[in-house]
Amino acid sequence: MSRLEQRFAQLKTEGRAVLVTFITAGDPGYDTSLKVLKGLPAAGADVIELGMPFTDPMADGVAIQLATLRALDAGQTLLKTLQMVSEFRVDDQTTPIVLMGYYNPIHRFGVEAFVAQAKEAGVDGLIIVDLPPEHDAELATPAQASGIDFIRLTTPTTDDARLPRVLERSSGFVYYVSVAGVTGAGSATTEHVTEAIARLRRHTSLPISVGFGIRTPEQAAAIARLADGVVVGSAFVDKIATAESPEQAIDGVLTLCAALAEGVRNARVS
């Protein structure tokens, strides 16, 4: 059983959802980003998505685009992102880490080398937003063969004809993008999310995590009552963007994480 499977199974037995947190690797700089990464589990993050900076983040909204630019300007590379995971694993061997991003940097790095180094670093899963299931052989197949989960995105526009193909080789969990559009867009209604989760459950037994547009403990709690996981990203990135110092960035992210974690943990308490 993978680290991701263990974490979702464990928290299901505890009767609560999983808090999945997203930050961009190297934003606003390597050292600060690493401190945030290392601090997230103690602040309540159950799974961490680590964004791999890329020069053309087409699926991301302004907040994450700017985070990517800050990271790239600070010298962040794919190799440094893998190094960051390795440094995290020195002290934490239990919190799952999922790398999220685009295929181009991986292709340039070399798929075989990337998969090998990601596994060695302690990466648990991949979300590659621009690599459809028709191209599984390029990355999903070698990643899963090495024990790295390959997580697919589904959206409100993924119809019943397409859904089985998207989910066929998915592993780890399913990431439901609750709002069609770029990251950081407005949030979906609970009625919409309820219907979407029910539809997904007819097609898969994998845990379902819901993201895009969740910014507050109240919103996180509402989704945690419905889904197996709650994904928050842009709200953390905004804390880094508005911070006046590295210390303020770290504190802002971890304080928000603790508040969101409390919302998720108390969501199903009667």
Swiss-Prot record:
Active site residues of this protein: 49, 60
The protein's Enzyme Commission number: 4.2.1.20
SUPFAM superfamilies per UniProt: Ribulose-phoshate binding barrel (SSF51366)
Pathway: Amino-acid biosynthesis; L-tryptophan biosynthesis; L-tryptophan from chorismate: step 5/5
Enzyme class label: lyase
Keywords, comma-separated and alphabetical: Amino-acid biosynthesis, Aromatic amino acid biosynthesis, Lyase, Tryptophan biosynthesis
GO CC term (a single one): cytosol
Keyword RNA-binding applies: no
Keyword presence, Thylakoid: no
One Gene Ontology term of the molecular function aspect: tryptophan synthase activity
Pfam families: Trp_syntA
Catalysis: reaction(s): (1S,2R)-1-C-(indol-3-yl)glycerol 3-phosphate + L-serine = D-glyceraldehyde 3-phosphate + L-tryptophan + H2O
Entry function: The alpha subunit is responsible for the aldol cleavage of indoleglycerol phosphate to indole and glyceraldehyde 3-phosphate.
SUBUNIT field: Tetramer of two alpha and two beta chains.
Family to which this protein belongs: Belongs to the TrpA family.
NCBIfam families, A to Z: trpA (TIGR00262)
Protein name from the UniProt record: Tryptophan synthase alpha chain
Gene that encodes it: trpA
